[in-house]
Regions:
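Peptidyl-prolyl cis-trans isomerase
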Residues: 77-86, 196-245, 260-261, 271-291, ...
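C-terminal motif of bacterial Sec signal peptides marking the signal peptidase cleavage site
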Residues: 18-21
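N-terminal targeting/tethering segments
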Residues: 23-24, 32-155, 311, 315-318, ...
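Soluble non-cytosolic domains of exported or imported proteins
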Residues: 53-57, 81-102, 114-121, 147-160, ...
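Bacterial N-terminal signal peptides that target proteins for export
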Residues: 1-9
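Proteostasis/folding factors centered on peptidyl-prolyl cis-trans isomerases
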Residues: 139-187, 211, 217-222, 242-299
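Envelope-exposed proteins and targeting segments
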Residues: 41-50, 55, 109-111, 211, ...
Length: 343
Protein backbone atom coordinates (compact mmCIF):
# COMPACT_ATOMS: atom_id res chain seq x y z
CA UNK A 1 0.00 0.00 0.00
CA UNK A 2 1.21 3.49 -0.81
CA UNK A 3 0.60 6.03 1.95
CA UNK A 4 1.69 9.07 -0.03
CA UNK A 5 -1.84 10.37 -0.26
CA UNK A 6 -2.67 9.50 3.34
CA UNK A 7 0.33 11.25 4.82
CA UNK A 8 -0.06 14.18 2.45
CA UNK A 9 -3.66 14.72 3.49
CA UNK A 10 -2.79 14.37 7.16
CA UNK A 11 0.23 16.65 7.13
CA UNK A 12 -0.83 18.96 4.32
CA UNK A 13 2.33 18.34 2.35
CA UNK A 14 3.08 20.45 -0.66
CA UNK A 15 3.31 17.21 -2.67
CA UNK A 16 -0.37 16.41 -2.31
CA UNK A 17 -1.49 19.94 -2.98
CA UNK A 18 0.73 20.44 -6.00
CA UNK A 19 -0.05 16.95 -7.29
CA UNK A 20 -3.76 17.61 -7.18
CA UNK A 21 -3.39 21.10 -8.60
CA UNK A 22 -5.67 22.75 -6.08
CA UNK A 23 -5.60 26.02 -4.27
CA UNK A 24 -3.73 28.03 -6.86
CA UNK A 25 -3.13 31.64 -5.89
CA UNK A 26 -3.78 34.10 -8.71
CA UNK A 27 -1.65 36.69 -6.97
CA UNK A 28 1.39 34.48 -6.43
CA UNK A 29 3.47 36.67 -8.74
CA UNK A 30 1.88 39.95 -7.69
CA UNK A 31 3.32 42.31 -5.05
CA UNK A 32 2.39 41.30 -1.51
CA UNK A 33 -0.07 43.46 0.37
CA UNK A 34 -1.01 43.83 4.02
CA UNK A 35 -4.59 42.70 3.30
CA UNK A 36 -4.84 39.66 5.56
CA UNK A 37 -8.08 38.29 7.00
CA UNK A 38 -8.74 39.32 10.57
CA UNK A 39 -9.54 36.65 13.13
CA UNK A 40 -13.15 35.57 12.83
CA UNK A 41 -15.63 33.76 15.03
CA UNK A 42 -14.96 30.00 15.36
CA UNK A 43 -18.12 29.10 13.42
CA UNK A 44 -17.49 31.50 10.55
CA UNK A 45 -17.48 29.54 7.27
CA UNK A 46 -14.33 30.12 5.23
CA UNK A 47 -14.89 27.57 2.44
CA UNK A 48 -17.57 25.22 1.10
CA UNK A 49 -17.22 22.01 -0.92
CA UNK A 50 -20.39 20.30 -2.13
CA UNK A 51 -22.27 21.80 0.79
CA UNK A 52 -19.69 20.74 3.39
CA UNK A 53 -18.43 23.78 5.30
CA UNK A 54 -14.98 24.54 6.63
CA UNK A 55 -15.17 26.78 9.68
CA UNK A 56 -12.57 29.26 10.81
CA UNK A 57 -11.89 27.12 13.90
CA UNK A 58 -11.24 23.95 11.91
CA UNK A 59 -9.13 25.77 9.34
CA UNK A 60 -7.12 27.46 12.07
CA UNK A 61 -6.57 24.24 14.02
CA UNK A 62 -5.28 22.49 10.92
CA UNK A 63 -3.20 25.46 9.74
CA UNK A 64 -1.55 26.02 13.11
CA UNK A 65 -1.00 22.27 13.36
CA UNK A 66 0.83 22.33 10.03
CA UNK A 67 2.92 25.29 11.21
CA UNK A 68 3.75 23.61 14.53
CA UNK A 69 4.69 20.39 12.75
CA UNK A 70 6.99 22.16 10.31
CA UNK A 71 8.69 24.07 13.13
CA UNK A 72 9.15 21.07 15.44
CA UNK A 73 9.73 18.23 12.97
CA UNK A 74 11.05 19.88 9.81
CA UNK A 75 12.93 22.58 11.75
CA UNK A 76 11.26 25.44 9.89
CA UNK A 77 12.71 28.72 11.16
CA UNK A 78 10.20 31.57 11.05
CA UNK A 79 11.46 35.05 12.00
CA UNK A 80 9.12 36.93 14.33
CA UNK A 81 8.41 39.56 11.69
CA UNK A 82 7.37 36.82 9.21
CA UNK A 83 5.12 34.80 11.54
CA UNK A 84 1.85 36.32 10.28
CA UNK A 85 2.92 35.63 6.70
CA UNK A 86 3.67 32.03 7.67
CA UNK A 87 0.26 31.67 9.29
CA UNK A 88 -1.41 32.91 6.11
CA UNK A 89 0.55 30.39 4.06
CA UNK A 90 -0.63 27.52 6.25
CA UNK A 91 -4.22 28.79 6.31
CA UNK A 92 -4.24 28.61 2.53
CA UNK A 93 -2.68 25.16 2.65
CA UNK A 94 -5.35 24.12 5.13
CA UNK A 95 -8.10 25.20 2.75
CA UNK A 96 -6.46 23.40 -0.19
CA UNK A 97 -6.16 20.21 1.85
CA UNK A 98 -9.82 20.51 2.86
CA UNK A 99 -10.85 20.81 -0.79
CA UNK A 100 -8.77 17.80 -1.84
CA UNK A 101 -9.95 15.64 1.02
CA UNK A 102 -13.63 16.59 0.77
CA UNK A 103 -13.84 16.07 -2.99
CA UNK A 104 -12.17 12.67 -2.64
CA UNK A 105 -14.25 11.58 0.36
CA UNK A 106 -17.48 12.57 -1.39
CA UNK A 107 -16.52 10.42 -4.38
CA UNK A 108 -15.54 7.56 -2.08
CA UNK A 109 -19.02 7.74 -0.54
CA UNK A 110 -20.57 7.74 -4.02
CA UNK A 111 -18.61 4.59 -4.87
CA UNK A 112 -19.41 3.05 -1.47
CA UNK A 113 -15.74 2.63 -0.57
CA UNK A 114 -15.52 0.97 2.85
CA UNK A 115 -12.57 -0.07 4.97
CA UNK A 116 -11.99 -3.61 6.17
CA UNK A 117 -9.83 -4.42 9.18
CA UNK A 118 -7.11 -5.69 6.86
CA UNK A 119 -6.98 -2.21 5.27
CA UNK A 120 -6.34 -0.66 8.67
CA UNK A 121 -3.65 -3.19 9.56
CA UNK A 122 -1.93 -2.73 6.19
CA UNK A 123 -2.18 1.03 6.63
CA UNK A 124 -0.62 0.93 10.09
CA UNK A 125 2.25 -1.24 8.83
CA UNK A 126 2.90 1.15 5.94
CA UNK A 127 2.65 4.14 8.29
CA UNK A 128 5.18 2.53 10.62
CA UNK A 129 7.69 2.30 7.76
CA UNK A 130 7.05 5.92 6.75
CA UNK A 131 7.61 7.17 10.30
CA UNK A 132 11.03 5.56 10.74
CA UNK A 133 12.73 8.68 9.43
CA UNK A 134 11.15 10.61 12.33
CA UNK A 135 11.94 7.90 14.89
CA UNK A 136 8.22 7.82 15.68
CA UNK A 137 5.92 4.91 16.39
CA UNK A 138 2.36 4.91 15.09
CA UNK A 139 1.20 5.90 18.58
CA UNK A 140 3.60 8.85 18.46
CA UNK A 141 2.03 9.85 15.16
CA UNK A 142 -1.47 9.92 16.58
CA UNK A 143 -0.57 11.38 19.97
CA UNK A 144 2.07 13.91 18.90
CA UNK A 145 0.42 14.81 15.59
CA UNK A 146 -0.27 18.50 14.99
CA UNK A 147 -4.08 18.30 15.31
CA UNK A 148 -4.66 16.18 18.40
CA UNK A 149 -5.11 12.43 18.71
CA UNK A 150 -8.81 12.17 17.88
CA UNK A 151 -8.48 14.24 14.70
CA UNK A 152 -5.28 12.46 13.66
CA UNK A 153 -6.94 9.06 13.97
CA UNK A 154 -9.91 10.23 11.90
CA UNK A 155 -7.59 11.75 9.32
CA UNK A 156 -5.74 8.45 9.11
CA UNK A 157 -9.00 6.58 8.49
CA UNK A 158 -10.03 9.11 5.84
CA UNK A 159 -6.63 8.82 4.21
CA UNK A 160 -7.04 5.05 3.94
CA UNK A 161 -10.42 5.53 2.30
CA UNK A 162 -8.87 7.93 -0.22
CA UNK A 163 -6.03 5.49 -0.91
CA UNK A 164 -8.58 2.75 -1.57
CA UNK A 165 -10.50 5.05 -3.91
CA UNK A 166 -7.32 5.90 -5.81
CA UNK A 167 -6.26 2.28 -5.95
CA UNK A 168 -9.53 1.36 -7.67
CA UNK A 169 -9.65 4.33 -10.03
CA UNK A 170 -6.00 5.11 -10.73
CA UNK A 171 -3.44 2.58 -9.52
CA UNK A 172 -5.15 -0.55 -10.83
CA UNK A 173 -5.52 1.06 -14.26
CA UNK A 174 -1.84 1.90 -14.67
CA UNK A 175 -0.13 0.38 -17.69
CA UNK A 176 3.62 0.34 -18.15
CA UNK A 177 4.71 -0.56 -21.67
CA UNK A 178 8.03 -1.60 -23.16
CA UNK A 179 8.31 1.83 -24.75
CA UNK A 180 7.99 3.54 -21.34
CA UNK A 181 10.82 1.39 -19.98
CA UNK A 182 12.99 1.91 -23.07
CA UNK A 183 12.52 5.69 -22.99
CA UNK A 184 13.43 6.03 -19.31
CA UNK A 185 16.37 3.66 -19.68
CA UNK A 186 17.69 5.73 -22.58
CA UNK A 187 17.27 8.93 -20.59
CA UNK A 188 19.16 7.49 -17.61
CA UNK A 189 21.92 6.15 -19.84
CA UNK A 190 22.25 9.59 -21.43
CA UNK A 191 22.53 11.15 -17.97
CA UNK A 192 25.25 8.68 -17.01
CA UNK A 193 27.10 9.30 -20.26
CA UNK A 194 27.13 13.01 -19.41
CA UNK A 195 28.72 12.11 -16.06
CA UNK A 196 31.35 10.00 -17.84
CA UNK A 197 32.23 12.83 -20.23
CA UNK A 198 32.52 15.24 -17.30
CA UNK A 199 34.92 12.90 -15.49
CA UNK A 200 36.94 12.47 -18.68
CA UNK A 201 37.47 16.23 -18.67
CA UNK A 202 38.50 16.17 -15.01
CA UNK A 203 40.92 13.30 -15.65
CA UNK A 204 42.51 15.25 -18.50
CA UNK A 205 43.10 18.17 -16.13
CA UNK A 206 44.77 15.77 -13.70
CA UNK A 207 46.98 14.36 -16.45
CA UNK A 208 47.89 17.94 -17.37
CA UNK A 209 49.11 18.56 -13.83
CA UNK A 210 46.12 19.57 -11.71
CA UNK A 211 46.52 18.63 -8.05
CA UNK A 212 44.57 15.44 -7.31
CA UNK A 213 43.69 16.26 -3.70
CA UNK A 214 42.51 19.79 -4.50
CA UNK A 215 40.47 18.52 -7.43
CA UNK A 216 38.89 15.81 -5.27
CA UNK A 217 37.91 18.38 -2.65
CA UNK A 218 36.21 20.48 -5.31
CA UNK A 219 34.45 17.91 -7.48
CA UNK A 220 34.29 14.47 -5.87
CA UNK A 221 30.84 13.37 -4.71
CA UNK A 222 32.14 11.01 -2.04
CA UNK A 223 32.64 11.70 1.67
CA UNK A 224 36.37 11.25 1.09
CA UNK A 225 36.37 14.56 -0.80
CA UNK A 226 36.87 16.29 2.57
CA UNK A 227 40.20 14.45 2.82
CA UNK A 228 41.28 15.17 -0.73
CA UNK A 229 39.89 11.85 -1.92
CA UNK A 230 42.02 9.78 0.48
CA UNK A 231 40.45 6.38 1.21
CA UNK A 232 43.19 5.06 3.48
CA UNK A 233 45.27 1.87 3.32
CA UNK A 234 44.03 -1.48 2.04
CA UNK A 235 45.17 -5.04 1.64
CA UNK A 236 43.79 -7.37 -1.01
CA UNK A 237 40.18 -8.37 -0.43
CA UNK A 238 39.46 -5.34 1.77
CA UNK A 239 38.23 -2.87 -0.84
CA UNK A 240 35.65 -2.67 -3.61
CA UNK A 241 36.25 -5.57 -5.99
CA UNK A 242 36.34 -3.15 -8.95
CA UNK A 243 39.13 -1.19 -7.23
CA UNK A 244 41.40 -4.12 -6.43
CA UNK A 245 42.97 -4.87 -9.82
CA UNK A 246 43.88 -1.25 -10.67
CA UNK A 247 44.91 -0.48 -7.09
CA UNK A 248 47.50 -3.26 -7.01
CA UNK A 249 48.79 -2.81 -10.58
CA UNK A 250 48.73 0.96 -11.02
CA UNK A 251 51.99 2.87 -10.56
CA UNK A 252 52.29 5.02 -7.46
CA UNK A 253 51.36 8.61 -8.29
CA UNK A 254 49.77 7.76 -11.65
CA UNK A 255 46.25 8.86 -12.56
CA UNK A 256 44.37 5.72 -13.51
CA UNK A 257 41.72 5.18 -16.18
CA UNK A 258 38.05 5.75 -15.42
CA UNK A 259 36.42 2.74 -13.80
CA UNK A 260 32.78 2.14 -12.97
CA UNK A 261 31.27 0.69 -9.80
CA UNK A 262 27.73 0.56 -8.49
CA UNK A 263 28.34 4.02 -7.02
CA UNK A 264 29.37 5.74 -10.24
CA UNK A 265 32.52 6.62 -12.19
CA UNK A 266 35.89 6.86 -10.42
CA UNK A 267 39.42 7.97 -11.14
CA UNK A 268 41.97 6.29 -8.85
CA UNK A 269 45.39 7.34 -7.69
CA UNK A 270 47.68 5.07 -5.68
CA UNK A 271 49.55 7.38 -3.32
CA UNK A 272 51.69 4.75 -1.58
CA UNK A 273 52.46 1.04 -1.74
CA UNK A 274 54.09 -1.13 0.91
CA UNK A 275 55.47 -4.43 -0.42
CA UNK A 276 54.53 -7.69 1.20
CA UNK A 277 56.92 -9.09 3.78
CA UNK A 278 57.26 -12.88 3.94
CA UNK A 279 56.97 -14.70 7.21
CA UNK A 280 60.06 -15.50 9.21
CA UNK A 281 60.70 -17.77 12.14
CA UNK A 282 59.98 -14.88 14.48
CA UNK A 283 57.25 -12.91 12.70
CA UNK A 284 54.17 -13.57 10.55
CA UNK A 285 53.86 -12.51 6.92
CA UNK A 286 52.75 -8.93 6.26
CA UNK A 287 50.56 -8.51 3.15
CA UNK A 288 51.10 -5.88 0.52
CA UNK A 289 49.18 -2.66 1.19
CA UNK A 290 48.26 0.32 -0.93
CA UNK A 291 47.08 3.77 0.03
CA UNK A 292 44.40 4.92 -2.35
CA UNK A 293 42.69 8.16 -3.31
CA UNK A 294 39.81 8.58 -5.72
CA UNK A 295 37.43 11.03 -7.31
CA UNK A 296 33.83 9.88 -7.64
CA UNK A 297 31.06 11.25 -9.82
CA UNK A 298 27.83 9.44 -9.01
CA UNK A 299 25.65 7.85 -11.67
CA UNK A 300 21.99 6.93 -11.69
CA UNK A 301 21.48 3.21 -10.99
CA UNK A 302 19.79 1.44 -13.89
CA UNK A 303 17.85 -1.72 -13.08
CA UNK A 304 14.48 -3.00 -14.22
CA UNK A 305 12.69 -2.77 -10.88
CA UNK A 306 13.91 0.76 -10.15
CA UNK A 307 12.88 1.87 -13.63
CA UNK A 308 9.42 0.32 -13.47
CA UNK A 309 8.90 1.73 -9.96
CA UNK A 310 9.86 5.20 -11.16
CA UNK A 311 7.50 4.99 -14.13
CA UNK A 312 4.71 3.68 -11.91
CA UNK A 313 5.13 6.60 -9.46
CA UNK A 314 5.13 9.12 -12.28
CA UNK A 315 2.09 7.62 -13.96
CA UNK A 316 0.32 7.32 -10.60
CA UNK A 317 0.92 10.98 -9.74
CA UNK A 318 -0.23 12.04 -13.19
CA UNK A 319 -3.26 9.78 -12.88
CA UNK A 320 -4.22 11.21 -9.49
CA UNK A 321 -3.89 14.72 -10.89
CA UNK A 322 -6.19 13.96 -13.83
CA UNK A 323 -8.65 12.07 -11.66
CA UNK A 324 -8.85 14.84 -9.09
CA UNK A 325 -9.21 17.54 -11.73
CA UNK A 326 -12.16 15.65 -13.23
CA UNK A 327 -13.84 15.33 -9.83
CA UNK A 328 -13.04 18.92 -8.96
CA UNK A 329 -14.63 20.18 -12.17
CA UNK A 330 -17.93 18.59 -11.11
CA UNK A 331 -17.74 19.81 -7.52
CA UNK A 332 -19.22 22.97 -6.03
CA UNK A 333 -16.25 24.71 -4.46
CA UNK A 334 -16.16 28.18 -2.97
CA UNK A 335 -13.46 29.87 -0.93
CA UNK A 336 -15.06 32.66 1.07
CA UNK A 337 -11.92 33.76 2.88
CA UNK A 338 -9.43 34.19 0.04
CA UNK A 339 -11.11 35.33 -3.14
CA UNK A 340 -7.87 34.88 -5.09
CA UNK A 341 -7.77 31.12 -4.47
CA UNK A 342 -9.11 29.14 -7.39
CA UNK A 343 -9.90 25.47 -7.68
Amino acid sequence: MQLTTTISVLLGSALALSMCGCGKDKTADAPKTDMQPKEMSPDHIVAMVNGTPLTWANMERRAMGYLKDDIEVNHLAVPTNRMEEAKEHFRRRSISAFVFKTVMMDEAANQKIALAEVDRLDGLRALEVTLKSRNWTTNDFFQKGPMGEAVMRQEFEDGLVIDKLLKRNVREKLKIGDEDIANLTAALEATNQTVFVKLEGIRKQLLDGADFADTARNVSEDESAKKGGDLGEFTRGKMLRDFEAPAFTQEVGAVGPIIRTRYGYHVLKVTARTPAVPATDSSPAVPETVRLSHILLKTVPIDHKRITDTIARQKYNEGVDVYFRDLKAKARIECLLYKDMTF
